[in-house]
Amino acid sequence: MTGQAALERSVSSHRLSVRSRLEGEAERAESAISRTDGDDDTCSELQRVTALELPSAEMLEAFTQRRPLARLVNLVLSLREWAHKSLVETEQRPDSFLERFRGPQAANDQSAAPADAPKKTFKERWEGFVVSQSDDIYYYWLFFIALASLYNWIMLVARACFDQLQDENFFLWVGLDYLCDVIYILDTCIRLRTGYLEQGLLVKDLAKLRDNYIRTLQFKLDFLSILPTELLFFVTGYVPQLRFNRLLRFSRMFEFFDRTETRTNYPNAFRICNLILYILVIIHWNACIYYAISKALGLSSDTWVYSGQNKTLSFCYVYCFYWSTLTLTTIGEMPPPVKDEEYVFVVFDFLVGVLIFATIVGNVGSMIANMNATRAEFQTRIDAIKHYMHFRKVNRTLETRVIKWFDYLWTNKKTVDEQEVLKNLPDKLRAEIAINVHLDTLKKVRIFQDCEAGLLVELVLKLRPQVYSPGDYICRKGDIGKEMYIIKEGQLAVVADDGVTQFALLTAGGCFGEISILNIQGSKMGNRRTANIRSIGYSDLFCLSKDDLMEAVAEYPDAQKVLEERGREILRKQGLLDESVAAGGLGVIDTEEKVERLDASLDILQTRFARLLGEFTSTQRRLKQRITALERQLCHTGLGLLSDNEAEGEHAGVPTHTHADIHAQPETHTRTSAETNSEEET
């Protein structure tokens, strides 16, 4: 007994020591975690992992000497480590690359609310509750209301026509009916609190929302759909026909279909399913009406109505549905009608069947055309290339390479023109989509890691995807450099002039070609390519032209310096930089750019000269018109005109100046001076 007590005391003391050691390690780990959380965002995840390393290797080695106790301790340590990891790493760290591009985002209402704010009661939350039509909860609610509406559209008419269906499951129908009524009432309450956009902002004023909903036609239909027509059951009994007002809620079902078509990734397939559903509902209604007419005229009363030989519900409905399908699809092969009522119903069915057939042909044809539009356009391009190569008698090897390149595009779904698809979006959304799509690639590019967000937006929007086949040269040494490239997928090899010797391997995320388009002063190669780069397999690249890069970098001098310095480093390593000349940066302009600028300046000068010439011609025309008008005015007043006697005197050489002539001479002189001045101005 004494030995057993001593053993128990030793085990308990050992457990206490183990517990104290574990608690000490846990406290040190928690303090390390708190210090790690207090650092800035630049701390690495490795620090978090090392802070959670509980316990040390020596401690575990000491525990493993006692196997039962070691297993227990290992279990405790594993549980503690798992608990710490789950507590520390529950929140995912934001991506700094995306945060720098997107900028500060507005916090949601819960995070923006102060911590010491009083908790709102249910009544206060309900008074401020407003549903936005763009929320997911609104879409999910549309799903339930669409189910309730579809249930009424299918089952009410069937229960009204087939008495056996109504009687066999009476309590089930009562429960489902009142469940749909509850959903309808809740939907009306939600519609009273459904916000709408006004000047781009969500309206949350409950009084305004209520007035806006009440003034619509939909409110009147919704109100009629929830009228308690079941009160008439006390007079007529539980007749499903009294619940036909529930069918007025059909607009919510159509709204759900429209939103689903917008959200789904397979809109064409959904449209086909939606069309099939409409057709089945129409056939179902027609089958029920056919049975109701047969029952009203008398079962087996003639050859056209339902015979009623088999009284089972399933056979009865299947036969009516079969008759309705043959009639609406205009197949016929059914007994002809006998009575006038039967003829009217069959004629109406034929008209509806023609409309259904036309709808099916039109919709299915357009859907199939839309589904195959991309393939048809792609096949047209292939056929045009094949025809051209056959017409120009291109060799078989090159033709095979072209066909394989097209096959690669189609197999890897690279036939979509991104610029054409995204052209209707604003630049901000286009840039954000491009960032999310090409994020992994852009993160690996060193040139983009420190650039400003505005430059990143411009560069991403200017990138053009290109696909190269195995063995294609992206650029050759000595070529004029007009583009730089960023590798998205694939591998490229820097090869010698023979095309076989491989110097380096470029993988996804690398960029090249920027040296030849930067126009760095002191570069011995100028704007020429400095290496041969060849595609090993199929490679997806992003191309950025020289004009686009210069246009974007011109407004960001810091990024311009980074590009310049990186280009100098590469040239210095390759021995292609003349340090004595390398004093400038990207300001060097080659001859081609100078000629382009001179052409632009010449166009501007020609435009200005044409404008000045037009102004001169217009001014000259106005002056001539003024001189002509002045001459006509002088002639009209008689100034400067000679009478017959004065004319004879002038011919005889006798001066015949009168007093009026003396007074007229200064005026004539004045007119001559005015004309002289006008001519001088001209």
UniProtKB/Swiss-Prot annotation:
Coiled coil: none annotated. Residues 1-41, 649-682 are annotated as: Disordered. Residues 158-169, 240-272, 333-343 are extracellular. It is found in: Membrane. Keywords: cAMP, cAMP-binding, cGMP, cGMP-binding, Ion channel, Ion transport, Ligand-gated ion channel, Membrane, Nucleotide-binding, Olfaction, Sensory transduction, Transmembrane, Transmembrane helix, Transport. Belongs to the cyclic nucleotide-gated cation channel (TC 1.A.1.5) family. This cyclic nucleotide-gated channel is activated equally well by both cAMP and cGMP. This is Cyclic nucleotide-gated cation channel.
